[in-house]
């Protein structure tokens, strides 16, 4: 999980979602997981 000021999809399978007001990227590739904060 990477914590970044700006989250962007890295590949085609990355999905940008919101959980409890936090923007996150979820993907098949665990390296692509990101969280805004």
UniProtKB/Swiss-Prot annotation:
GO biological process, one term: translation
UniProt cross-references to SUPFAM superfamilies, sorted A to Z: Ribosomal protein L36
Record GO terms (molecular function): structural constituent of ribosome
Keyword entries, A-Z: Ribonucleoprotein, Ribosomal protein
Keyword flag Zinc: no
Statement: the UniProt record of this protein carries the keyword Iron: no
GO cellular-component term (any): cytoplasm
Pfam families linked: Ribosomal_L36
Database matches in InterPro entries: Ribosomal_bL36, Ribosomal_bL36_sp
Family the UniProt entry places it in: Belongs to the bacterial ribosomal protein bL36 family.
UniProt protein name: Large ribosomal subunit protein bL36
Organism of this sequence: Halalkalibacterium halodurans (strain ATCC BAA-125 / DSM 18197 / FERM 7344 / JCM 9153 / C-125) (Bacillus halodurans)
